[in-house]
Amino acid sequence: MNLKKALRKKKKQVRELEGYRDKLIEYDNHLDTLGERNSYSKTDPGATFMRMKEDAMKNGQTKPGYNLQIGTENQFITDFRLFPNPTDTLTLIPFFHSFQYRYNRLPNICVADSGYGSEENYRFMQENGIEAFIKYNYFHKEQRPRYTPNPFHAESLHYNAQEDYYVCPMGQHMNRIGTKRDKTASGYITESARYKAKRCEGCPLRGSCFKARGNRIIEVNHRLNQYKRQARERLLSEEGIKHRGRRCIEPEAVFGQMKYNMTYRRFRHVGEDKVTMDFAFFAIAFNIKKMCAKLIKEGKGFITVAKYMFMGLFITRYNWNIATCCQMHEEKAA
């Protein structure tokens, strides 16, 4: 009797181990599909859950999607690429590699918003001879008429570059005590110098300067500050003002045409390869349509314009048929 109980117990343990084995294989497959991302969609493993700009419920709901990056020139789409990560900071350098693969060269000038302003991106563009007109995170705040810098922030303290020390608001020297290294999500190593004050106890400005215990310690990334100074000089120059003015009517106008005038708000296929093909067709049709409008404005011949219009209408109609079918299926499902 005891032998039968022991045998049943062993069989039960074997079944449990087999179930654990199957689950372990399933979890390994999920991790392989996930890669370096934090999430993925079951219906489209290539898509990542992101917070979209169109949030009807205003609750930060995440939806599966792709981060589409485009390059434009005179409102023509020159290049595009899809990324699984929601932040724009990590997309600039891979986008440059995609541009180089397509055109066998890198662009001479890059104009972008503050979402791309990181030390890694600034350094890449400087080393590759790209003139960067890219804002950093608080550039717009500095340009406000009533902006006054906080005298207690590390950026506002006087720095002696020869002897490598800072001077606090009370005139005390803050000597360097070491270097802090951090690794970004892309693997880039940033270095920040650490400076410490000697006697903060009893200082009348301590309540406004900092509230932690002990003496104040600041961390300064000198390389990033140098890149920001160079970016500020470029952005405030005459050429920089011209590029900043065109920034609003270049990629933003293209996205506005796509979403609102051409109702292209969602991809109609599943999988990164098919989604790339989807947008490639759209980009071709968009550029042809733009070229037709430009030729008509310049007074070109009817036959030349008709050729471009026929090609654009064919591709746009193909995409429109797909969109109509998808909409019908969604209505039936609802």
Positions of PLM-derived features:
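Anion-binding and metal-coordination hotspots
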Residues: 1-334
